Amino acid sequence: MQYTEIMVRYGELSTKGKNRKNFIDRLGFNVRESLHSFENLVIKAHRDRMHIQLHGEDYEAVMKRLKQVFGIQNFSPSIKVERDIEKVKVTAVEMVKEKFKEGMTFKINTRRSDHNYQYDTNEMNDILGSHILREVPGIKVKMKNPDMTLRCEVRADGIYLSHEKIDGAGGLPVGTAGKAMLMLSGGIDSPVAGYLAMKRGVDIEMVHFFSPPYTSEQALNKAKDLTAKLTPYVGKIRFIQVPFTEIQETVKEKVPSGYLMTIQRRFMLRLTEAIAQRRKGLAIFNGEALGQVASQTLESMAAINDVTTMPILRPVVSMDKNEIIKIAQDIDTFDLSIMPFEDCCTIFAPPAPKTKPRIDKARYYEERLDVDALVQRALDGIEITEIKIGDTFLNQEKKVFAELL
């Protein structure tokens, strides 16, 4: 069957009232970004539907990409037919015959946005249903839970036929809920947190701390590849790498080992907040899950959060590890996340970090450091990479070797 377009139905946008146009415009932008490699597509976003005209493009490849765009409730590969009822009847029979199996049941579901068309909804249902019963021997009508629902949408520019309704990603279009920074490590949790943030419409930029020579170029590229795994949901994501070596060496030299993790993460939060302010971010997301490690107790979170007034959002905070892993597998970040490259959170990890650090002690130990100067030098060294769909950074030979370790 040669489909001519994909009809997209919106998700939560129907609840957005006066802001609906802004949401639809943003969804249209995101769909164009996600599908930019399909050169022949024509995308038209209307108030109640989006129409993606295929013009010969592979509809299955387009739909695979569409499944990852937030803000879409569902979509259907469709055939546009002239408003000639005889041509509609012929096409309807062809669509049913292609999927027909002995004993199959069906119904017709007509939706009419053009009320000037010569046949109303019930008449269209009767005309098409009767014709299919005559032309497809063995098929039966069933109004509740049929094997196939043939959808017919009557519009001013034509009649659209479809028989599949494929679930989209749901959520809200990325960018409709503002911008935030995601503290991206190389682990399992933070990419999942980023995915969940984007699902609620947040435009995220990745902030990744690296500490050469203690962390390798491959570890940095792994974080970039994790970012690339999330680009199909939005089209492109900015990756901000922050040099962290001097801060870690200084903290290790001047702070008791039990507070190393706390002070390091306070610096990370200061830096992320400063980057967010520069880049008009409204919040910070991270992958902390309560109680997983020493830095993720409530006492640790309070001691670390002490350095900022910016909202810190933790989408996976109440999830079990298995729940997080399931999402990571679904979004295809898990296998990459468990590759054994070192990151700056582990290279100077103390043998017995404080699980209940005190805010007053954290402040006291920081008095030994020139905090402002350390932060400024790190900010001066940041690099920003725009990562697009299909980008890869990890050296494949080294990647294979790492998987064998």
From Swiss-Prot:
Keywords for the protein's UniProt record, in alphabetical order: ATP-binding, Cytoplasm, Nucleotide-binding, RNA-binding, Thiamine biosynthesis, Transferase, tRNA-binding
GO cellular component terms, semicolon-separated: cytosol
Pathway(s) per entry: Cofactor biosynthesis; thiamine diphosphate biosynthesis
Matching InterPro entries: Rossmann-like_a/b/a_fold, ThiI_AANH, ThiI_fer, ThiI_N, THUMP_dom, THUMP_ThiI, tRNA_STrfase, tRNA_sulfurtransferase_ThiI
Protein's cellular compartments: Cytoplasm
NCBIfam families in the record: tRNA uracil 4-sulfurtransferase ThiI
Protein name: Probable tRNA sulfurtransferase
